[in-house]
């Protein structure tokens, strides 16, 4: 866990101290990061977190640190690398696949297809996984330096990787 700060010197110290970074779930990624406008369907975002994580990601990427994103984290990484997001899945990507599951949250709700020759396929040696899902934003257009490694039944991108790293 890192302190929430926009102090560039503290962020530089964190990058120099840590071997890698996990960008986690949480509030929405602010649409301005991927050149969109906020709509009434957008959820809460945290400008301070977006600013800190943008600087942190930039420095960590520049220094070739290990970076992993989960949920909001993968969406954030895609956005700061030049990709776009669906601001609200219900209105921008209506589908039969449940991406905002009800309780219990630990029970898989849908499956994802793992792309052949992806790091995830090589790691798990499987073509599909059952997953939980609790988000209303998602990757829309993949950033130029990223590739898809898993998609849901409705074609929504569920996992990305950077082949150059």
Task: Please annotate each region the language model reported.
Residues 21, 59-84:
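Catalytic nucleophile loop
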Residues 35-38, 81-84, 146-147:
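Short, glycine/charged-enriched secondary-structure capping and boundary segments
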Residues 33-34, 43, 61, 81, ...:
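Ubiquitous "structural anchor" signal
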Residues 26-29:
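Short glycine-rich anion-binding loops that position phosphate/pyrophosphate groups of nucleotides
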Residues 33-51:
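A short, gly/pro- and small-residue-rich
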Residues 87:
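Class I SAM-dependent methyltransferase SAM-binding "motif I" and its flanking Rossmann-like core
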Residues 11, 31-34, 78-80, 160:
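Short glycine-/acidic-enriched loop or helix-start segments at secondary-structure transitions
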Residues 1-19, 23, 46-63, 90, ...:
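Amide-donor transfer/coupling interface in amidating biosynthetic enzymes
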């Amino acid at each position: 866990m890192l302190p929430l700060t926009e102090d560039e010197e503290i962020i530089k110290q964190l990058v120099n101290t840590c071997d890698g970074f996990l960008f986690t779930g949480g509030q929405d990624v602010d649409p301005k990061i991927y050149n969109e406008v906020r709509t009434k369907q957008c959820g809460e975002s945290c400008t301070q977190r977006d600013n800190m994580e943008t600087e942190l990601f930039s420095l960590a990427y520049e220094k070739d640190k290990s970076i992993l994103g989960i949920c909001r984290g993968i969406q954030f990484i895609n956005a700061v690398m030049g990709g776009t997001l669906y601001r609200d899945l219900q209105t921008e990507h209506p589908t039969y696949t449940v991406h905002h599951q009800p309780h219990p949250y630990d029970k898989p709700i849908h499956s994802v297809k793992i792309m052949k020759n992806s790091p995830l396929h090589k790691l798990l040696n499987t073509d599909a996984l059952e997953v939980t899902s609790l988000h209303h934003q998602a990757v829309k257009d993949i950033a130029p330096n990223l590739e898809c490694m898993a998609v849901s039944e409705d074609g929504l991108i569920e996992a990305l990787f950077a082949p150059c790293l």
